[in-house]
């Protein structure tokens, strides 16, 4: 009897017809994708995107040249040169470079920073035409921080209970 049923299924192409109807049902269903350049999807506050150096509200840069981010970076993508000590005993960076080609976006630099100076912001659209444009210097990082400060501060505030 089972041989007869198997022959009937083969003759009527039952698997083919059921697969065809499944494909047609999926073809005419609403698509879950978004039209990317024109529509933006949700980005988590914990998203790790383009790096930025932050400033204090008075305009002074936050980085105290402790070099913890440089020491903890597994890809060795961060290079820092510290300036001389100032009268108040603090130091600031003379040079702060990140090689974004080497960076693996692990977030260790952000976690290690005691003053929340280096952060990974919400920007994920930073494609370049040349490799040299992915070597970020201090000015580029400070410019990113100024551009994304509102979003960065909001994300840090929302993430604070989990740290």
UniProtKB/Swiss-Prot annotation:
Cofactor(s) the record lists: [4Fe-4S] cluster
Keywords: 4Fe-4S, Cell inner membrane, Cell membrane, Iron, Iron-sulfur, Membrane, Metal-binding, NAD, Quinone, Repeat, Translocase, Ubiquinone
Keyword set includes Acyltransferase: no
Residues annotated as domain 4Fe-4S ferredoxin-type: 53-83, 94-123
Gene Ontology molecular function: 4 iron, 4 sulfur cluster binding; iron ion binding; NADH:ubiquinone reductase (non-electrogenic) activity; quinone binding
Topological relation to the membrane, as annotated: Peripheral membrane protein
Locations listed in the record: Cell inner membrane
Described purpose of this protein according to its UniProt entry: NDH-1 shuttles electrons from NADH, via FMN and iron-sulfur (Fe-S) centers, to quinones in the respiratory chain. The immediate electron acceptor for the enzyme in this species is believed to be ubiquinone. Couples the redox reaction to proton translocation (for every two electrons transferred, four hydrogen ions are translocated across the cytoplasmic membrane), and thus conserves the redox energy in a proton gradient.
Family (UniProt): Belongs to the complex I 23 kDa subunit family.
Protein name, per record: NADH-quinone oxidoreductase subunit I
